Amino acid sequence: MADERTGDSVKTRYDIALMNLNDIKIAVFRDSLSTYVEQKTGLTIQFNWPKSRCLVISTLCKIPFPTKSAAELQEMCKYQCFVSVL
């Protein structure tokens, strides 16, 4: 997984992180109630987020949702990938 940083944007190419990127619908800040990022087409997804945040990238059963623990989020998500932004 390689990334290209430009300002506050991070462009990340997920080649093998997830089997089917079409299953990724949104990205959500774990500690936010309102930040949602739609998937780009193909293997490239671009997010705008504050630095040093943990994202949950997944197909969610229901949104919006209050801040949840990792276990509670896992129950809500069909697919889940945690990405830490350095």
Curated annotation (Swiss-Prot):
It comes from the Viruses. This is Protein U17. It comes from Human herpesvirus 6A (strain GS) (HHV-6 variant A). The gene is U17/U16.
